[in-house]
Amino acid sequence: MWMLMILVLPLMAMTYIAWHVRVMLPLSALWKSAIIAVGVLSFAMLFLNFRRAFDGMPLSVAQMAYEVGTSSIIVLLYLVMIFLLLDLGRLVHLVPKSFMYHNGYTALGIFVLLLGIFIYGNLHYNNKVRVPLEMKSQNSLPREYKIVMASDLHIGYHNPRKELARWVDMINAENPDFILIAGDIIDGSMRPVLEERMAEEFHRLKAPVYACLGNHEFYSGVPGAKQFYKDAGIHLLIDEAAVIDSSIVIIGRDDRTNMRRKPIKDLIDSLNSKISNLNYTIVLDHQPYNLDRAEAAGVDFQLSGHTHRGQVWPISWITDRLYECSWGSHQRGNTQFYVSSGIGIWGGKFRIGTQSEYVVATLK
């Protein structure tokens, strides 16, 4: 199934687009072939990323290649949608044949439309949305807490140190009591993270940071990710807990990529046997699956990420149907959930119909 999605469907889409480019552009065969070749090479860079080929390139070249490769998949998606709409229009006789063949005005219109969509998407991505959230404990707490929550930073070739620095400044401006990160801090390769010394940026955070692993830490290599978290001063919780003020318990789950991770009920039961005052339980679980199990275990609040809410429409429609909650607040019995669409991004830096965000919560 994954091979079909990653390889076969994109090849079919590129063939479909290439055919339309050949019949639509009023250019010589050489120019048409050159344009198609550029598109194919751009998309090929996406697979170079999976093969870690960028690690052998100069950092600036690797960053540019990553941007081109991961952006191409979104350009491909929108071109397919546009050509499908035009083809459907032709079938029902709403679009004349002349509109589709050797028509430079149509090609220019499509280019301008895509340019507008992606300029908007990039501006929207860079506008990080501050999401306020209320959390209420059924038990008494020593005081009120301000918590900043985030997920899916994906630092690396795509999100370099200068972007991470901007996020650190935004979080520090909130003056939180502590910070929670629900996985995927690292995008993939450790090379840009180490070469740009990104751990130094996390040391600028003015509050303690608690985090869990995401699936992308498994891509980068868990041992290397764990060492980076240690160097960055992040409290990494892998099926273990941290206690704040003898009343708030933060449990970080191993990512479900590890199929042998401990069940949430076992983690809670173990804590109940060791800690008498579990006044409020927070769980960090990167992927928002099996929410019923967190509810049954008596979790007060769970923070997740992973979905990105699809990043762009109409993929957001798919994620909304794949998950019980693909984004935002959700309540199940006495358990409150928040699934973040992420402060960072994987793929092209476009947010279309979704948002990049960080959560500022008040726990009372």
What residues fall within each predicted segment?
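Short N-terminal secondary-structure initiator segments
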Residues: 1-6, 124-131, 191-199, 224
